[in-house]
Amino acid sequence: MLPNNQWQIPINNGLTHQENMAAHAAVMKLRVHDLQSIISQLSLRKPRPQKSEHQKVVVESLRDPHHARQIYQMASNFPNGNYEMQKRPATTSQVRSHPYVLPSRSGASNHLVNHHYQQQQQQQPQPHNLLHQQMMASHHSHLQQQHHPSTVRWLTPELLEEQLRGSMRYGAPAAAAATNAPLHSSFPNHGRSSQQSLQKSEKSNRPKKMYADNFEPLPLPFYDVISVLLKPVELHSSDSPTLKQTKQLQFPFLLTAEHISKISYRADVTPLPRYELQLRFFNLTEPVQGPQKDDFPLNCYARVDDSVVQLPNVIPTNKTNAEPKRPSRPVNITSNMNRYKKEHTVAVEWLADKRVWAAGVYFVHRVNSDILFKRLNQNVSRHRSLEVTKQEVIKKLSGGEDDIAMDRLNISLLDPLCKTRMTTPSRCQDCTHLQCFDLLSYLMMNEKKPTWQCPVCSSNCPYDRLIVDDYFLDMLAKVDKNTTEVELKEDGSYDVIKEEAFCISDDDDDDVVPATVNGTASCSSTNGNGLANEAAKKKPADDDIITLSDDDDEELNRGIMNSLNDSFSPGRHTASAELAAQKTPPQQKKKTKDDDIEIITLDDTPPRPVAASANLPMRQMSQQNQMPVGSSPSGMASTQMGMNEGASKTIRDALNKIGEQSANSSTQSSPLVQLHHTTHPLNFAQSSYMNPSSGSQTPTSQYGYSPMINQAPHFQMQNGLIGRNNQMVHMQQHHLQQQQQQQQSPQIMSPSFYAQQQMSNGGAFAYYPPQYPQQQYRQN
């Protein structure tokens, strides 16, 4: 598109300079369909659908001498959008026979006049109609003398009434008497309805104001208004008070070169602060005292230079038939406009009802929370002095005018928004509480979602009403960094409140260790005299500490497993016995004079005979698995507890000698145990946990056999002899050997308690103390 100043250069297109300027101005005023008709008639190149592209094609064609004259004539003949229109030649079908055939903007008014005229023709005689024809002829001649013959004006109701009265003055003398009568007297049947229709038509055709009444928009802290590009224009209400209508309006505005240079950036990557173009809507239905906040019309839709503006999303609601509402915030239209163009247009479409709205465009400078924080913190007038707040504290705690005094007033030093320690305590001037909040946190929260509500009392807390309290600012500088709460006094001073926190340990120490916060022990009380600490130190440890431990049992089991592998190693018996003797069952700790803690070991497992079990041969270990009928594991455990170390050593020596004698008369490596073949009143039975059908077991098992036994031996009983295969030993010889052992060392248990037992899994023998009844069973 060529600007106007370039048409001052002489162009050789066959038109004068004035004609070129007139043609250019006429083209710029044409509508899109008029431009399209010129392009189609002259067969010009087809432009893009934008109006600016159509204008560009037509203006460029003015340089062509073949099209310049035609474009000038066609553009000049098109209407320019004003209230004047070109008069077309009337045809015979358009000639009216009554005197009220004047064009009107409203088709309803013409129809109403025609209707009244038809009824008048039916009631009045024909000569009266001739009189009206004469009046019509004289009226047309009078209009042709006053107005330009090529145009007529659109009539308003006032002009229509004036012309009707004038037509009567130019008529017959009989009609002159009607000039003093009211207008509706000519229509006796429908005079009232005609007057009401004219009043409605006058009201609907009355020109409406473009700009809204003066009001004060709500100032936005994060937007500094530089200039007003479009003064708030009025979005009119619906013509019918009960019906809603969809309306559209377009408003032009201009940008200067300075504005264009400041917004020539990419809005998505440019950080704050930056310049923006802002579109705002307001509700002007009811007069509101104070600034007007942003409010969007119903079903609002906006476009800037044919680009759709993204409005804030509708707030979701669960209420039925609720009117959709949008958040109260401005709209950034910087990215919706051509930044290198001066003339712009805003088009707004909305659903009009009885409410009145307004829309305006502003050029603003957008800032962030850090800039607002510096502005308020550096402004001395926005700081409340220490003495003013101190007097307010004294007034609240002493009762003041209300005679209601508080016992104490605790103030938290933590920000109610972030739950962290405040750095710049601030509050609203209109709030009555003394509790403050952090200024920077409050500004950052409202930058993301502008609500401007006090975090303490939820009342309105705008930016221009915020203050910085120097009383609490001085308090934060003096108290410890770990302090989170203070108590205000009646004289305006304060005490630091520190919480008592102690850690209860499960150790045997009597000392109470205070809990630490960030490496510093907090053990002071509310009054600072330290009474709580002294009481905590003098508090005796009366609680019983119970220790549940299985470490000793694990060591015993480990010793037993080692003894199974070394049961026939004579050199290791002594070392195993010494090791097992050192590992005694856990005993109760002795109480000292300073120790009042009683240690209880909740271990219902009976202690085991460590020394005996650690050095018994494999077959003697298997003998312990035999239990008499009617016995229980608990009885077995108590019997083992009764065995002392001397008895265990005697039994071990006796069994070793029997094994050596059996080994001398046999080539087998496993010993044979000799027993009396006599009937004993005590019979033995197999333990329930011994499987008679099981074969040879691994040496690592508690009930296993020595590695020297490769196969399970088979025992036989013949004539008082017991042995494996043909290796038989007299029972009498075994009895003599047992008597010799009794004479050498004190014997607690008689060898007669070793009963004969034939087992299919290797011929193992079991030993039981004399207090248990023994029963002997022969296995099948």
UniProtKB/Swiss-Prot annotation:
Positions bound to Zn(2+) = C431, H433, C454, C457
Any single biological process term in GO: negative regulation of mitotic DNA damage checkpoint
Q: What class of enzyme is it?
A: transferase
Similarity comment: Belongs to the PIAS family.
Q: Report biased composition (Low complexity) as residue ranges.
A: 732-749
- Gene (name only): gei-17
Which species? Caenorhabditis elegans
Report the outcome of L417A. Greatly reduces E3 ligase activity and decreases smo-1 chain formation
Q: Annotated pathway, please?
A: Protein modification; protein sumoylation
The record's section on InterPro entries has: PINIT, PINIT_sf, Znf_MIZ, Znf_RING/FYVE/PHD
- Extract the Pfam families matched here: PINIT (PF14324), zf-MIZ (PF02891)
Please list the GO terms describing molecular function: RNA polymerase II-specific DNA-binding transcription factor binding; SUMO ligase activity; transcription coregulator activity; zinc ion binding
Source taxonomy: Eukaryota, Metazoa, Ecdysozoa, Nematoda, Chromadorea
Region annotation (Disordered) maps to: 181-210, 519-544, 560-594, 732-755
Subunit notes for this chain? May interact with gex-3.
Q: What is this protein called?
A: E3 SUMO-protein ligase gei-17
